[in-house]
């Protein structure tokens, strides 16, 4: 009953020209309504044939263009009609056109849709190739059967990928748990001195576990969705193939496009051989370094700085801190006094007041926040003579310098003897320093002829060691703040 009324209403609001529901309906004085685009096209046609009067395409009653009025009432009916969704009991049958109510007997090859005879004559399908459903059903049955077999194969591949990612996830979990266990066991042996390293290593592994398992879980979720999607397509195809001819062809374009556009995506995985693996021997080496540092600290001496006559070097009152300042050079030109702010390459090396002629001696220098410095020991000069060390500086062991340095904030170097081709210039070799030191320890063993440098910031790791040093003269602690104005500080034994 309701469907019959609905069809009658649809007839009343269907454009007589395009046979579709009215779009932006306009009403003529005679009462007939048309789509705005359709009646406008009718006007142009009348002008083309030079007709003196414009007439209604239905009843042929003449009208003037200015008498055409928008029909809001009809527009509202059309809008409501488009929103109507009938229940299965009251709605149209599945084999009837939802738009025209006519029986679906034809198949449009271009749109791959089942249509009625009115659809075939509409603007949407005009010029398309249409066939009776019986003529194309077998062809599409073969296509869908082939697609079903292909999807079943893809289902197997998808399930294998899903299983692989789950196995990969479990493998990563076991591997990382194993590494965590090793870390805990190794750090337990070194608990007193390696608490920081233990915490740092565990944090790294926790972050690695979180990142990798999170990524693998996302991949697993994608694989599950992918598998489910394939299953849904298979279920849809099986339903179509087992149903009626109408069910086979109804919406077949959509299902074919989904199948054609579907490609299986492989999950993101990680290579175990590319990750950083924790090794306990490194901790044992760290323990050896720490024990060596503990041993040399027994020889800590209270070093202070000697007075100097270098104008651009500032020594603190406690004689533990030294810093450099940029020189300001005054000069006359054209009868006027000018100030130059140019940074000349002045030397800024300072000696410690304590001379070393025997035994073992150790001290530490705070170099935090500095971008450049040089430190170590220097031989052959008497600091109490107010001698400007820098006038004859040549950082080579053969000239009495056993030093290391930093430049540009990241480049650590050791100054060695120059080659035979450049004997008067030191060979500056780069040092591999993983953790930048805020404090450097210096140890001199006069009898063993060695000078060692320790990274106190990194648990006393050895930075560099000079061996077979020629200590034919007294040696002194040496500090050079270079052009960086941040001070260098000699640490007291109690610090």
UniProtKB/Swiss-Prot annotation:
Residues that coordinate or bind Zn(2+): 97, 100, 119, 125
PTM statement from Swiss-Prot or TrEMBL: Degraded in a proteasome-independent fashion in the absence of viral infection but in a proteasome-dependent fashion following exposure to restriction sensitive virus. Autoubiquitinated in a RING finger- and UBE2D2-dependent manner. Monoubiquitinated by TRIM21. Deubiquitinated by Yersinia YopJ. Ubiquitination may not lead to proteasomal degradation.
Role, per record: Capsid-specific restriction factor that prevents infection from non-host-adapted retroviruses. Blocks viral replication early in the life cycle, after viral entry but before reverse transcription. In addition to acting as a capsid-specific restriction factor, also acts as a pattern recognition receptor that activates innate immune signaling in response to the retroviral capsid lattice.
GO molecular function: pattern recognition receptor activity; ubiquitin-protein transferase activity; zinc ion binding
UniProt lineage: Eukaryota, Metazoa, Chordata, Craniata, Vertebrata
Keyword Transmembrane helix set for record: no
Region (Required for interaction with GABARAP and for autophagy): 187-200
All residue ranges annotated as the B30.2/SPRY domain in the record: 283-495
Zinc finger (B box-type): 92-133
Catalysed reaction, written as an equation: S-ubiquitinyl-[E2 ubiquitin-conjugating enzyme]-L-cysteine + [acceptor protein]-L-lysine = [E2 ubiquitin-conjugating enzyme]-L-cysteine + N(6)-ubiquitinyl-[acceptor protein]-L-lysine
Alphabetical list of PROSITE patterns matching this protein: B302_SPRY (PS50188), ZF_BBOX (PS50119), ZF_RING_1 (PS00518), ZF_RING_2 (PS50089)
One of the GO BP terms on file: positive regulation of MAPK cascade
Modified residues (Phosphoserine): 87
Keyword Transmembrane helix attached: no
Pfam families cross-referenced by the UniProt entry: SPRY (PF00622), zf-B_box (PF00643), zf-RING_UBOX (PF13445)
Keywords from the UniProt entry: Acetylation, Antiviral defense, Autophagy, Coiled coil, Cytoplasm, Immunity, Innate immunity, Metal-binding, Nucleus, Phosphoprotein, Transferase, Ubl conjugation, Ubl conjugation pathway, Zinc, Zinc-finger
UniProt comment concerning the protein's domains: The B box-type zinc finger domain and the coiled-coil domain contribute to the higher and low order multimerization respectively which is essential for restriction activity. The coiled coil domain is important for higher order multimerization by promoting the initial dimerization.
Entry's EC annotation: 2.3.2.27
Species whose genome carries this gene: Erythrocebus patas (Red guenon)
The protein's annotated pathway: Protein modification; protein ubiquitination
InterPro entries assigned: B30.2/SPRY (IPR001870), B30.2/SPRY_sf (IPR043136), Butyrophylin_SPRY (IPR003879), ConA-like_dom_sf (IPR013320), SPRY_dom (IPR003877), TRIM/RBCC (IPR050143), Znf-RING_euk (IPR027370), Znf_B-box (IPR000315)
Localization, UniProt: Cytoplasm; Nucleus
The name this protein goes by in its record: Tripartite motif-containing protein 5
């Amino acid at each position: 009953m309701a469907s019959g009324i609905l069809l009658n209403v649809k007839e009343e609001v269907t454009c007589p020209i395009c046979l579709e529901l009215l779009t932006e309906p306009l009403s003529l004085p005679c009462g007939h309504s048309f789509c705005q685009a359709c009646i406008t096209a009718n006007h142009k046609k009348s002008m083309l044939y030079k007709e003196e009067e414009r007439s209604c395409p239905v009843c042929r009653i003449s009208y003037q263009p200015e008498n055409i009025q928008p029909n809001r009432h009809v527009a509202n009916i059309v809008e409501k009609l488009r929103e109507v969704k009938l229940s299965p009991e009251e709605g149209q049958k599945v084999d009837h056109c939802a738009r025209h109510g006519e029986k679906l007997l034809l198949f449009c090859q271009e749109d791959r849709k089942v249509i009625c005879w009115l659809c075939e004559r509409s603007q949407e399908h005009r010029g398309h190739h249409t066939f009776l459903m019986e003529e194309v059903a077998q062809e599409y049955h073969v296509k869908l059967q082939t697609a079903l077999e292909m999807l079943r194969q893809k289902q197997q591949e998808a399930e294998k990928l899903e299983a692989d990612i789950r196995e990969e996830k479990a493998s990563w979990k076991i591997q990382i748990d194993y590494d965590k266990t090793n870390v805990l066991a190794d750090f337990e042996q070194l608990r007193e001195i390696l608490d920081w390293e233990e915490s740092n290593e565990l944090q790294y592994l926790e972050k690695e576990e979180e990142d990798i398992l999170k990524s693998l879980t996302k991949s697993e979720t994608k694989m599950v969705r992918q598998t489910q999607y394939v299953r849904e397509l298979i279920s849809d195809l099986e339903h179509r193939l087992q149903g009626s001819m109408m069910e086979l062809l109804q919406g077949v374009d959509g299902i074919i496009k989904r199948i054609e556009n579907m490609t299986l995506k492989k999950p993101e995985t990680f290579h175990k051989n590319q990750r950083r693996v924790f090794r306990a021997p490194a901790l044992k080496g760290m323990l050896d370094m720490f024990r060596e540092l503990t041993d040399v600290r027994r020889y800590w001496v209270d070093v202070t700085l000697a007075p100097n006559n270098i104008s651009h070097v500032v020594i603190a009152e406690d004689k533990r801190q030294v810093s450099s300042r940029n020189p300001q050079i005054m000069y006359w030109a054209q009868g006027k006094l000018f100030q130059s702010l140019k940074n000349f390459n002045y030397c800024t090396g300072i000696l410690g007041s304590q001379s070393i002629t025997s035994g073992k001696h150790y001290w530490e220098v705070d170099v935090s926040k500095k971008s450049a410095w040089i430190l170590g020991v220097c031989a052959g000069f008497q600091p109490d003579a107010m001698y400007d060390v820098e006038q004859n500086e040549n950082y080579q062991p053969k000239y009495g310098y056993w030093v290391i340095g930093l430049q540009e904030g990241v480049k650590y170097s050791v100054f060695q003897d120059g080659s035979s081709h450049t004997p008067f210039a030191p060979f500056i070799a780069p040092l591999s320093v993983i953790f930048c030191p805020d404090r450097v320890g210096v140890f001199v063993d006069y009898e063993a002829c060695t000078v060692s440098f320790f990274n106190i910031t990194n648990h006393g790791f050895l930075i560099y060691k000079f061996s077979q040093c020629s200590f034919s003269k007294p040696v002194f602690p040496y500090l050079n703040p270079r052009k960086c104005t941040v001070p260098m500080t000699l640490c007291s034994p109690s610090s």
